[in-house]
Amino acid sequence: KGQIPWEQGIDLHGLSIDEARDQLSEFIRASFYQKCQAVLVVHGKAYSQNGSQPLLKSYSNDWLRQLPQVLAFSSAQAKDGGTGALYVLLKRKK
């Protein structure tokens, strides 16, 4: 709900699927080791050229589910990108 302020963010606009996956994974790991509690991931709302679902949005959803450092995530508030961005809550580093 945006009640926990995000500490770092990443923008995946303009990246290929492979670049976005690698950068998102690296960003989440680095944020976790820096003991961030919440981060912002901007994937955008752009639809692919043939009018199908936004690729980075759906891929980001899948990738975040696979990362062990991620506790939860949800769409951001409008001021932070709305449905084109995600708040990601990270697990606490022990």
Cite the ranges covered by each PLM segment.
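Long, charged, low-complexity intrinsically disordered regions
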Residues: 1-38, 42-94
